[in-house]
């Protein structure tokens, strides 16, 4: 797609001239709010309603600034710093010896982080005989979610032009193989007090969970980065509670912040994110929590609970974004 960032969303000619950008860890993914994948013969395969924050969380765990120079990240308009992101938002103006340069829109190509791009290795594609027609539904992000910066206000906006979806195919096999796909289920909640409990069920056999946070006053407002992985005010303890496959209660109370981070990294390592490391996490400005269950847990009938001891209060509530990782075989 071609990207044009605007100072006045009602006028396509008001190209941004500085002070506006999008998260360097996300690049073009920042403009996607949600992704839904549906197979006609199966139904809904995956629905990630907070997609951009998921991509950002993956990035802080698996990428450093030098990784953004690789071609597969540069083509997504990811960057080594926010100054570059502001330059992308201004458009691309060639240097000319003579004549008047014409500013062009920056273009990008992203590989969506959804189940269609997380299939088991060694399998010769996904058979249409098994899936039927495949629908990929994408909802674009609100202006104040996608953009941030000193001069971003309610009039700022963006346009995506010349959108196109490409896919690679091979002749359908007469004896299609089973395909296992990585799936993400998301859940949003909030913290309103220092002693908070969040409980949820997920229609999946979950293998791990990861979560990130942002103060409510910093989300979907001018200037602030809505995708920032913020720390939790006065975090003292996190405790995870769920029933194992043998139906015995498992409790993980964690008070050490280093262990909290290590558990988050472990929650991402076996979910098609093979580049994650604690060193890369520490090189990025962000915070997240997580837990690897060490086995697939059926959370459709088994409630997952997390308890957090913090100094959060109702005057400054915190939004919580949880991501449960599972696999589905077609």
Where are these regions (language model features)?
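Short, low-complexity Pro/Thr/Gly
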Residues: 1-330
